[in-house]
Design a protein with these regions (language model features):
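Conserved phosphate-binding/catalytic region of the ribokinase-like
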Residues: 3, 194, 198-310
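Conserved phosphate-binding/catalytic loop of the ribokinase/pfkB sugar-kinase fold
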Residues: 84, 94-132, 137
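A glycine-rich helix N-cap at a beta->alpha junction
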Residues: 71-86
Length: 310
């Protein structure tokens, strides 16, 4: 059944200035509304590498909810386990500056408690034959527990990402059961109660290696924007993955694409360094387009011997 992705769906409302952005002032520009959410983006990114993921999540019981399901279906994502419920989708409102970076954002999270019952009733069917699990860590605590129980039952690897680190901090103890956790530099600072914003990759790599050992986290990757990413494992292996040099149009979804690429690599036999390299390529492909997901690739472009199933 491919990689199972579990998480929330958002509607992204994005504003772009037509001239020089004035913080605190009125800015003429354009406003776009697109399907978003970390996990939804990750599922579509995986599908765009001609793999066939399964998305487990919720959408609104409205026309917009149907649109989300239809788009995922068009990208060959298995949507059998998406439920339509009231308040099933969140909203993310973001303002971008002239460099394509988010300068202000606010989000309304959806009610994801119906996922608990969904996993109770269909968890065995969802996880039994999957290749691995990609989990949004800031879901309901019970949903995270259920997922980890099924992963242990069926011997599946679990890879985690966050959309709200403040909420994910309440699930910090679960990181010891996660095969690889991916977050950005700011989120890593919150996780370890420190400020890493001034660190260069070499120093960040050393700090991360020490932290994963002391916190007993099996594996962790920290993205650092245009400085690339660093990774570290509890066994002492660590390294740096340089960023790809591309012209920035819109950074939305770059972190999600990096996570998707890393999960793809780790699931289908690549080393952690090779997997992060796939993530870096997918992230670069998102940054230089207006979409918040990567364009189409084939597995062989990343050295993956995975059959493409139509």
């Amino acid at each position: 059944m491919g990689i199972v992705v579990i998480g929330a769906v958002f509607v992204d409302i994005k504003g772009y200035p037509l001239s020089t952005y004035i913080p605190g002032g009125r800015n003429a520009g354009r406003v776009e509304q697109v399907h978003g959410g970390v996990s939804r983006n990750v599922a579509e990114d995986i599908a765009n590498v001609e793999l066939r993921p399964t998305f487990v999540g919720l959408v609104d019981d409205t026309g917009m909810g149907l649109d989300v399901i239809e788009k995922l279906n068009n990208h060959k994502v298995n949507t059998r386990f998406i439920q339509r419920v009231p308040d099933g989708m969140g909203t993310w409102l973001a303002i971008f500056n002239n460099d394509g970076d988010v300068c202000a954002a606010i989000s309304k999270r959806p009610d994801t408690t119906p996922l608990i019952r969904l996993l109770e009733e269909q968890g065995n069917e969802i996880f039994r034959d999957c290749d691995s699990i990609a989990l949004e860590l800031d879901l309901e605590k019970e949903t995270v527990k259920q997922t980890l129980r099924y992963a242990k039952k069926y011997g599946k690897k679990v890879y985690a990402v966050v959309s709200n680190m403040s909420i994910a901090m309440e699930r910090r103890d679960f990181l010891q059961q996660i095969d690889c956790f991916v977050c950005n530099q700011q989120e890593a600072g919150l996780l370890f109660s420190d400020d890493y914003g001034h660190l260069e990759p070499e120093e960040m790599c050393r700090v991360l290696a020490a932290n994963v050992r002391s916190a007993n986290i099996p594996c962790m990757v920290v993205t650092m924007g245009d400085k690339g990413a660093v990774y570290a494992q509890a066994d002492g292996d660590c390294g740096i993955v340089p960023a790809k040099k591309v012209d920035v149009i819109d950074t939305t979804g770059a972190g999600d694409a990096f996570f998707a690429g890393t999960v793809i690599g780790l699931t289908y036999g690549k080393t952690l360094a090779e997997s992060c390299e796939i993530g870096s390529r997918l992230a670069a492909s998102v940054i230089c387009i207006t979409e918040n997901v990567c364009p189409r690739f084939r597995p062989l472009e990343f050295g993956l011997d995975v059959p493409v199933v139509d």
